[in-house]
Every structure is written in structure tokens, then in C-alpha cells.
Amino acid sequence: MKFLVNVALVFMVVYISYIYAAPEPEPAPEPEAEADAEADPEAGIGAVLKVLTTGLPALINWIKRKRQQG
């Protein structure tokens, strides 16, 4: 009988510590932030232009090196 009580106590301690250790769910995104992102399409264009201005010269240099190598 004492063994069963000990097993039950250990189970309770493990279960309670598992409940408290569980991460809290992430908060839902604010609808205003999503609406702002959809309302301003130029923000996306700026990101695309930034990628093009930084990545395009690197791509051109890579193509030039490959042509020179053979």
C-alpha cells in the first residue's frame, strides 16, 4: 500500500511540474498590423528593390567570373 502511495505522489509531482513547464501559447497577431501591411503595398516594393540592388551586382560579378574561368 505504501508503494502505491509513493507511486501516486511521484506521478502527481511529475504531472504538476509538466503542467507548469509547458510553454504558454503565442499571442495572436494583432489585426491592425495585418491590415496596415495589406494597406501599404509600397512597403513590399521597397523590400524587393533592396534585394535587387544588393543581389544583382553580386550575381553579375559571379557570371563575369564564370565566363573568365572558362
UniProtKB/Swiss-Prot annotation:
Gene Ontology biological process terms, A to Z: killing of cells of another organism; monoatomic ion transport
Which keywords does the record carry? Answer: Allergen, Amidation, Antimicrobial, Cytolysis, Formylation, Hemolysis, Ion transport, Membrane, Porin, Secreted, Signal, Target cell membrane, Target membrane, Toxin, Transmembrane, Transport
GO cellular component terms, semicolon-separated: extracellular region; other organism cell membrane; pore complex
Question: Which is one Pfam family of this protein?
Answer: Melittin
Q: Which InterPro entries match?
A: Melittin/Api_allergen
* Tissue expression from the record: Expressed by the venom gland.
Where is this protein localized, as stated in its record? Secreted; Target cell membrane
Is this entry keyworded Ion transport? Answer: yes
Q: What's the impact of mutating residue 61 to S?
A: Increase in cytotoxicity when tested on E.coli and cancer cell lines, increase in anti-inflammatory properties since it inhibits more potently IL-6 and TNF-alpha (but not IL-1 beta) production in melittin-treated cells, and increase in interaction to small unilamellar liposomes
Q: Where is this site: Important for the flexibility at the center of the helix, flexibility that is important for the stability of the voltage-gated pore?
A: 57
Q: Which domain of life is it from?
A: Eukaryota
> What Gene Ontology terms describe what this protein does at the molecular function level?
porin activity; protein kinase inhibitor activity; toxin activity
Where is this protein primarily located? Answer: secreted
Q: Where Glutamine amide occurs along the chain?
A: 69
Give residues where N-formylglycine occurs. 44
Q: Which residues form the signal peptide?
A: 1-21
Q: Which residues form the propeptide?
A: 22-43
Q: Which family does it belong to?
A: Belongs to the melittin family.
Write out the function statement from the record: Main toxin of bee venom with strong hemolytic activity and antimicrobial activity. It has enhancing effects on bee venom phospholipase A2 activity. This amphipathic toxin binds to negatively charged membrane surface and forms pore by inserting into lipid bilayers inducing the leakage of ions and molecules and the enhancement of permeability that ultimately leads to cell lysis. It acts as a voltage-gated pore with higher selectivity for anions over cations. The ion conductance has been shown to be voltage-dependent.
Description of how the protein assembles with itself and partners: Monomer (in solution and for integration into membranes), homotetramer (in solution and potentially as a toroidal pore in membranes), and potenially homomultimer (as a toroidal pore in membranes).
What is this protein identified as?
Melittin-N
This protein's species is Apis cerana
